[in-house]
């Protein structure tokens, strides 16, 4: 018997995000004060902060992996970059999809 998912108002999310930018972790009294200001329970605020910290950590990890992939896949070379803007745009739209070269298929090395 779980509680239903509650969608926060834009004003509540704005206030949560504004406070998160100032401070990634809240003490219990700070959490209670913020919760009463935006009409949420302290538990809702606590969980939102936990989820948001995880989301930021995951986004940073994905961004670092994407930058590493771009560096590894020939960031140099200079000319002939006609397809690059489209490729970069596609990568920005789906940051968690990563191209992985096939090195071994059916136990046999693939030609490079």
Swiss-Prot record:
Residues 73-83 have a biased composition (Gly residues). One of its GO terms (biological process) is positive regulation of DNA-templated transcription. Its main location: nucleus. Phosphorylated on serine residues. Keywords: Activator, DNA-binding, Homeobox, Nucleus, Phosphoprotein, Transcription, Transcription regulation. It comes from Cavia porcellus. Residues 84-93 have a biased composition (Low complexity). The gene is TITF1. One of its GO terms (molecular function) is RNA polymerase II cis-regulatory region sequence-specific DNA binding. The keyword Phosphoprotein applies. It is found in: Nucleus. Residues 1-60 bind DNA. Pfam families: Homeodomain. Residues 59-100 are annotated as: Disordered. Transcription factor that binds and activates the promoter of thyroid specific genes such as thyroglobulin, thyroperoxidase, and thyrotropin receptor. Crucial in the maintenance of the thyroid differentiation phenotype. May play a role in lung development and surfactant homeostasis. Gene3D superfamilies: Homeodomain-like (1.10.10.60). SUPFAM superfamilies: Homeodomain-like (SSF46689). GO terms for cellular component: nucleoplasm. The keyword Phosphoprotein applies. It comes from the Eukaryota. Belongs to the NK-2 homeobox family. This is Thyroid transcription factor 1. InterPro entries: HD, HD_metazoa, Homeobox_CS, Homeobox_NK-like, Homeodomain-like_sf.
